[in-house]
């Protein structure tokens, strides 16, 4: 019995060591990953005008975990966290609003996390070169990037696995998936270029130079990517297969 217990403890210890190494690896990656890869894109959150009451919250805002306090739409100045909904008042939720810090889309996660800690901010507004809000990054988003064995923004937003193998060597992929995560799933030796697109959708748009529609294709890292589902804004889902 003692020997079996020792073996079990050894296996458990090895698993813990593996997890710790992965966390350390993820922490080191914070210096390389841009906020654009982790942020929640503009179309994924809800903005509500003042005043904001509990009855105004819809399922999307609850799933997102926060609601943006209404403004001019070009910049996000504050959000209302919804992590503890049971303790929220019925009226005037805007009184609980927290200011967000602005950060450029090209910033790396490590300095942004440090700035959030220094300013006691729970979220950052990601802005493009014109000062327009293109995304929101929360403290929880960064924690997920650190603690998850395979960090994925698409999985976090969609609440399902964004890359599914439908047949051997053929994958259905959500277009929101980052190329960094996709390369890990496909076991590719790929390091994202800070100057290039970060998602499957962005890759398609860059290569085609237009909004992709169903049937459009492009090539990437020895694979062919074909759009199998799209909306008016662009691709939603693609099929990826290795080129023979």
Regions inferred by a protein language model and the residue ranges of each:
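Soluble cytosolic regulatory domains appended to membrane proteins
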Residues: 1-244
């Amino acid at each position: 019995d003692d020997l079996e217990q020792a073996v079990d403890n050894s296996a458990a210890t090895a698993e813990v060591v593996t997890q710790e190494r992965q966390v350390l690896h993820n922490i080191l990656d914070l210096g390389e990953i841009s906020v654009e890869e982790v942020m929640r894109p503009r179309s994924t959150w809800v903005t509500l005008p003042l005043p904001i009451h509990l009855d105004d919250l819809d399922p999307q805002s609850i799933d997102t975990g926060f609601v943006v306090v209404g403004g001019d739409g070009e910049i996000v100045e504050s959000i209302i966290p919804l992590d503890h909904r049971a303790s929220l008042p019925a009226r005037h939720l805007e009184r609980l609003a927290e200011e967000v810090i602005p950060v450029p889309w090209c910033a790396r996660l490590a300095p942004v996390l440090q700035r959030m800690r220094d300013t006691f901010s729970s979220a950052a507004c990601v802005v493009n070169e014109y000062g327009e809000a293109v995304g929101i990054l929360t403290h929880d988003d960064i924690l997920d990037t650190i603690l998850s064995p395979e960090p994925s923004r698409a999985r976090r937003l969609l609440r399902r696995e964004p890359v599914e193998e439908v047949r051997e060597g053929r994958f259905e992929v959500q277009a929101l998936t980052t190329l960094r995560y996709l390369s890990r799933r496909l076991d590719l030796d790929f390091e994202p270029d800070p100057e290039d697109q970060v998602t499957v959708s962005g890759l398609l748009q860059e290569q085609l130079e237009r909004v992709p529609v169903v049937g459009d294709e492009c090539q990437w890292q020895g694979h062919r990517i074909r759009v199998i589902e799209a909306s008016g804004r662009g691709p939603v889902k693609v099929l990826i297969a290795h080129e023979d």
